[in-house]
A protein has these predicted regions:
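Polytopic alpha-helical membrane proteins, predominantly small-molecule transporters/carriers
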Residues: 1-106
Length: 106
């Protein structure tokens, strides 16, 4: 049962890559960032589908979205100087705990 979770976590990481990549595509007018973003999106979806063959779809999708949301929020703070507040930090921590809670209860 290790491999489906590995697929899922890599898919979540790639979701962060394509979401952040959208900032660099300039509406998909820049070909290199657009190619990177599209490739990350495609591989992320394929790995999510592969993980969902063995994991409950509700759990797989929730974990995938959670990793993407958490990672994208963190990258927004680190790369794009997006604001961080105490409440945002608390909810990001709760999201992190929720991802692992879903993994351990699946």
């Amino acid at each position: 049962m290790f491999l489906p979770w590995l697929y899922l976590f890599v898919a979540g990481f790639l979701e962060v890559c394509w979401a952040v990549g959208l900032k660099y595509t300039d509406g998909f007018s820049k070909w290199m960032p657009s190619l990177f973003t599209g490739t990350a999106l495609l591989i992320s979806m394929l790995l999510l589908a592969k993980a969902a063959q063995s994991l409950p779809i509700g759990t797989a999708y929730a974990v995938w979205v959670g990793i993407g949301a958490l990672g994208t929020a963190i990258m927004g703070i680190l790369l794009f100087q997006e604001p961080i507040s105490l409440f945002r930090l608390i909810f990001l921590i709760l999201l992190f705990l929720s991802i692992f809670g879903l993994k351990y209860t699946a």
